[in-house]
């Protein structure tokens, strides 16, 4: 087992990042947590001991690089992902943060003496035939990718190129699915969906399938990858294949609310998405359905069966029941709503 006395975590207030910080603290590790907002960092980690908040942004890695000194391992979870979430095109931000920011972070970590890192990749870098199991070897071509997917593919290429040119640096890549779980201050699309279901705002079911995973299980996968992962290897942490027709009724049952039964036709989904994007532009608020999301659902339908044999064999990774994940997500959202 490697020495992990002090870890540096980017994206620390995010759904994955904050759960990773908590898991590291529970294992006796000190954590330097990169946050864009100290206020949000204090809100997320107010009562957690062993966390040092570092204010910084992935668009200016040099500004926080001195804090990488003295760390044993780097966990990179920060990413810009709103291309599929807020609507519109965000390629400059996607490239600046997900691609260029990753490269600069690795360069600064190496200069600071860090020789072990775990990079958060995505199932977006993989592709396969509908209904067939997809593993870490099923790589997606960048020309078969939207802007967000392309940014994750290019980020992986940056990571692997860095490892090739720095033979004394060790790094692994973890590929999460659609993450759910508690402490989602964002909120990300999973908590947005849960809130919409609980508040009766979901007009109907959408077609398509997803791979649902607990952010806490992904956090454990990151730690296991740091401890046991092989150099320059990808490890899936995608979770369980589910259709929206399975997920929403389960969410309703656990939350104790009625859920829609009908599946919305695709032409209507495109109209709703266009209207939501217009609303997002006017209000600046996140939306559940963007045009990019609808296109993605159509393109990726039934391409969410992932084979975790490698992660199970080499990392010892397991997943908690999806019912527990949804239950904990709902409970946290309700408690958080009551407090705010």
Annotate the PLM regions.
Residues 104, 189, 206-227, 233:
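Substrate-positioning beta->alpha
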């Amino acid at each position: 087992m490697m020495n992990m006395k002090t870890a540096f975590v980017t994206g620390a207030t995010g759904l994955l990042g904050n759960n990773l910080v908590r898991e590291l603290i529970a294992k006796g590790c000190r954590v330097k947590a990169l946050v864009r907002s100290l206020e949000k960092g204090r809100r997320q980690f107010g009562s957690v001991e062993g966390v040092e908040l570092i204010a910084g942004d992935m668009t200016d890695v040099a500004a926080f690089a001195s804090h990488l000194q003295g760390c044993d391992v780097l966990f990179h979870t920060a990413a810009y992902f709103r291309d599929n979430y807020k609507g519109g095109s965000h390629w400059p931000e996607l490239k600046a943060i997900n691609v260029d920011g990753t490269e600069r972070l690795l360069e600064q970590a190496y200069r600071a003496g860090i020789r072990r890192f775990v990079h958060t990749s995505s199932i977006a870098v993989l592709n396969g035939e509908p209904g067939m199991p997809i593993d870490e070897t099923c790589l997606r071509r960048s020309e078969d990718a939207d802007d967000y997917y392309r940014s994750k593919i290019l980020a992986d290429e940056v990571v692997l190129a860095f490892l090739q040119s720095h033979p004394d640096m060790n790094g692994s890549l973890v590929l999460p699915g659609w993450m759910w779980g508690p402490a989602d201050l964002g909120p990300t699309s999973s908590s947005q969906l849960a809130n919409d279901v609980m508040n009766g705002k979901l007009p109907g079911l959408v077609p398509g399938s997803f791979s649902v995973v607990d952010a806490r299980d992904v956090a454990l996968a990151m730690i296991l990858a740091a401890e046991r992962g092989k150099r320059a290897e990808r490890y899936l942490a995608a979770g369980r294949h589910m259709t929206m027709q399975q997920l929403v009724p389960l969410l309703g049952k656990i939350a104790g609310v009625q859920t829609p039964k009908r599946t919305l036709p695709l032409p209507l989904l495109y109209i709703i998405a266009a209207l939501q994007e217009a609303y997002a532009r006017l209000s600046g608020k996140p939306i559940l359905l963007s045009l990019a999301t609808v296109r993605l659902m159509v393109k990726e339908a039934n391409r969410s069966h992932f084979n975790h044999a490698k992660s199970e064999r080499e990392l010892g990774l397991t997943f908690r029941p999806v019912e527990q994940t949804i239950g904990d997500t709902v409970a946290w959202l309700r408690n958080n709503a009551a407090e705010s």
